[in-house]
Amino acid sequence: MFLTEAEILDTPLSLNYTCQYFEKNKKNLEQFFQENQQKKFTILGCGSSYMLAKSTASLFASLLGTSANAIAAGDYIVDPLFWYETVKGSIVLLLSRSGKTSEMVWALKHIKEAHGCPAVSITTEDGNDLMPLCDLNLTLNWCHDDSVCQTRTVTNLYASTLLLAAEYARDDRLRESVLAAMRESTSFQLKYRPVLAEIANLDWDNVVVLADGPICGIAEEGALAFTEISMLTGRYFHLLDYRHGPIVVSGKRTLTLALLRPGEEKLQSAMMKDVIQRGGPVVTISHC
């Protein structure tokens, strides 16, 4: 078994640990948000964690009275003055596998000096370089991926941002949805692995992932996984926006994965008909 495969198969167990960890830290999270009542968030990441930062920002910005922005740490350190007003007065959330990425550490040091913002890190390595700079550290050392491409780590970081948002917003429904996904993850893997094997055996050599809303970042990370693991071209686009230009490169050997949102059928169905007409295999993922 390949290392990446083993890490993916371990995801249900690691998600269970992550959910337990957040339950154990519930009082710490409550205290942090009581002491820091800003309604503004800046989420920093690099690479995969920046993609997750975009999903996190989308989610937090949807909460009542809350604004949120995702910034690539490398973008920030190139021109911190440009981001001055964006970051000022915010809670800074840092997503990182190692917690040692130089751009992340430099960016947080600058933000602390320039703004004194409270900071929360979510990482998978204990004793990392971000921890001494943060006001709250959430360390998920059971889901650290040794593979170059993050899989299990990404899933757990994403779940962590959902649980953090649930605590911030006191949203029990969001928290329960994460717990439900965790409980069903093993059966989900077993049910769909044969289907995934069939899809893998189809004739395709490039991938497009389509998604909107709070899953946009993790969808983009999914496209990156095809590039890093399969060494094929993987691209991400917003669902309906795909029609406005990028669809012209879709062909008979383009595998399209579309994450459809519940509650709207007409527009999404019309978009999928356009994609199907391009001739390549199409897979839809939706919540029934």
Regions found by a protein language model. Name each.
Residues 9-19, 61-70, 176-185, 223-234:
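Acidic/glycine-enriched edge-of-secondary-structure segments
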Residues 25, 34-183, 212, 247, ...:
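Glycine-rich phosphate-binding loops that contact phosphosugars or nucleotide phosphates
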Residues 182-202, 208, 225, 230:
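Accessory alpha-helical/coil subdomains and C-terminal extensions
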